[in-house]
From Swiss-Prot:
Known function: Plays an essential role in the virus replication cycle by acting as a viroporin. Creates a pore in the host endoplasmic reticulum and as a consequence releases Ca(2+) in the cytoplasm of infected cell. In turn, high levels of cytoplasmic calcium trigger membrane trafficking and transport of viral ER-associated proteins to viroplasms, sites of viral genome replication and immature particle assembly. The secreted form acts as an enterotoxin that causes phospholipase C-dependent elevation of the intracellular calcium concentration in host intestinal mucosa cells. Increased concentration of intracellular calcium disrupts the cytoskeleton and the tight junctions, raising the paracellular permeability. Potentiates chloride ion secretion through a calcium ion-dependent signaling pathway, inducing age-dependent diarrhea.
Annotated family: Belongs to the rotavirus NSP4 family.
Alphabetical UniProt keywords: Activation of host autophagy by virus, Enterotoxin, Glycoprotein, Host endoplasmic reticulum, Host membrane, Host-virus interaction, Ion channel, Ion transport, Membrane, Secreted, Signal-anchor, Toxin, Transmembrane, Transmembrane helix, Transport, Viral ion channel, Virulence
Transmembrane segments: 52-74
Species classification: Viruses, Riboviria, Orthornavirae, Duplornaviricota, Resentoviricetes
Residues of this chain annotated as glycosylated in UniProt: N50
UniProt name for this protein: Non-structural glycoprotein 4
Organism: Rotavirus X (isolate RVX/Human/Bangladesh/NADRV-B219/2002/GXP[X]) (RV ADRV-N)
Domain of life: Viruses
Amino acid sequence: MEGTSESPILDEFEANSNDYDNEFISRFSQNPLHAFSLFTNGNIQEYFMNNSLEKIIIHIVLIIISLCGIKAQTSKIIYIVRLLFWKMYNVINNLVNKMINREKIADRQIVDNRFREFEERFRILLLQHDENIAKQDNIVQYNKLDNFAESIKSEFNLKVAEMERRFQELKWRCDMIANKTMNTIVLTNTVDSTNKDEKIIFDEGSVVQYNRE
């Protein structure tokens, strides 16, 4: 069983990438127990520092398989372990992608909510602006109507004042005519009364003179 292009992730797990790995494979291929000599020469710290976690796990799995008495080719065992890690990688990657997708969905929902909130605020702002414009238009119309009413009121007051002035003038003329008429009547009555007194009252001298004649 060999690697294919369908599993490119397997190429990242190269077992023969450093001296420690090559030495481990060579000793393990001769005798699995010889691999333990790498850990008895005081190089265990350097071994763990120079090998990745995947390779260390592969080496441990190979040692366990060999100690259990299962004899198989090293390359096939390594490939099987690679497949196992590839499967684990896919599972973990799928889980990570699901979590990322959930976060993206959550972020998208947050963005949608923010956008809807902004849209609602913008709509309310437009309504308020329209209401303000309508109020201003109403105020302008009211001011125009009020000015028109004030002009009519002023004109009416002027007409009333003019009518009152004419009425006062007419009243004054009527009073003048009435006074003249009354004066004429009084004078006439006075003259008539004087004439009547002259006819009724006779002077004694005049009477004596009349008798003589």
